[in-house]
Amino acid sequence: MQKRYTITPEFIKFSDINKDDFILSSSLYEKVNFKNTNGIFLKELLSCSLSNEFKGSDVGSDNYVDQSPYTFLRTKALQDFNYLPDFNKESLLRIKPSSFKEMNLKKGDLILSKDSNIGEITILDDDYPKMMISSAMYKLPIEKDKYYIFAFIKHSAFREQLDLLVPKGATIRHAKTLFLGCSIIFPKKNREKIIDYIETLVKSVIKKEKLIKIKHEKILHSIENEIASNQKDEVFTFSQPTISELKKKNRLDTNLYGSYFKEINFKIKNYKYGYSTLKELGYELSRGQNLQISNIGRSIYSKRYRSNFYELMLPKFLSKYGTVNKVEYLGNSNKLKILKKGELIFGAEGFEKGRSIVIIDEKEKVITNIHGITIRKKREQNLKQAIFIKCFLDFLRSKGVIDLFAVGGNGGSLAQKYWDEIYFPNLSEIVQDTVSNLYHNPEAHYNKEFDMATFYQIDEEFNSKAGIYELDKSMKLIKNKIDEVIDAIVQDNDPQLTFDFLKTI
């Protein structure tokens, strides 16, 4: 975590050293420096005391099962790049009904992590009567200014306070209830107006995150329905692999011979409008840039934007929705392998392989690393077709097909030799348009003047048109604006409460 408000004193009093048992570690004397002292401890903002009824409970791995309506939420669901919980096979586990503890989780509840990723927080977008949280989390009983407090806890001003309060552990850190001693800084002037502005923006982000999930599901359902409703007369029958099939794949340790894979593959090949491979569609595959010193020499890495640096879009930073959770920057004097508009990055390795993204805007210096496969059209780029390819790969990933191709340990990798066995249905232009617009709609813009009174309506109009790409882009701009306003509050400056920043979309 890059510290913005933490300072180390140039000198200390002997009495301070004596009080701390003569420990001379500089970190022990660090403190946060907020120009605005109008803060209230988090514990004073709770609607009631934080008793054990608000703390989660552990169930033990013996209670994990494959099928159950009851679920167990772990701290991995709380991520700094999301407002809503990130549900996946590692963060949300199914458990035996007998181990379930009722926690009455409701829409709008704030869930904060006290262990591991300490201080991370999420807000629930729905009621979850059959979900419980782990003992590493608390449900915060907050009613007044809930969304403002949520935004402040997400901000580095809160995290830096907590970092100084929590002992530095060797591996996992435990905050217990020390987070209650952190201050939430409030505006000195125009308090209600500023809080209303931030809460309006927070609610907009929550709406957009939810819509991204909904539109991604629509993409998957559209593809599945199109294939299922346009089958030829042939009927699938499973057969064991032949000798020639075994020789062709040269593998015995694979599920590609199983009925599950063969049935999915059959439906694609049985699509009445035909199918094609990537090569037949005019695309080629290549590995991303090798960033090792032996290949490109020394580089400078930065988490912040720097002019003339390459934008580093790594597969591990991609979400399953085709967005980027974060980027880093790399300075290097060599001419590296850049990505152009209409090209894809596909994460081919690890337990989360199969995540991908399309480069929508023309950018000067975007690169990925060798763990990513780049998919590019040999001739003129076709953005709509590239988006369909990305969305169909998402569909295969959602069905577990990408994992079935994997070779090797630690999640395995999708070797390039297997891409000739991945078939893409020849969807009509109309269907491709429908799928493509759910991911990227170039007609979605904030092209009206608006203020606090009209923002909600105009934001709703934008959201209804926007694809996943536009929702994510606007969401990131709004999050940056929220951080900018909170920073101004902490520094005791007058924040600019405008919406002009959205006109770039």
What residue ranges belong to the model's regions?
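A short beta-sheet element
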Residues: 74, 113-153, 336, 345-392
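Short, surface-exposed loop/turn microsegments at beta-strand edges and helix-strand junctions
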Residues: 61-70, 84-90, 102-105, 122-135, ...
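Non-catalytic DNA-recognition/assembly elements of restriction-modification systems
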Residues: 1-60, 188-300, 428-505
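Sequence-specific dsDNA recognition surfaces
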Residues: 39-61, 76-107, 279-300, 314-341
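A short glycine-rich beta-alpha junction/loop motif
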Residues: 130-138, 168-193, 365-373, 407-434, ...
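Short, contiguous, well-structured surface segments enriched in hydrophobic/aromatic residues
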Residues: 45, 69-74, 307-312
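Well-ordered mid-protein domain cores that form the structural environment of catalytic cofactors
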Residues: 78, 96-99, 103, 111-121, ...
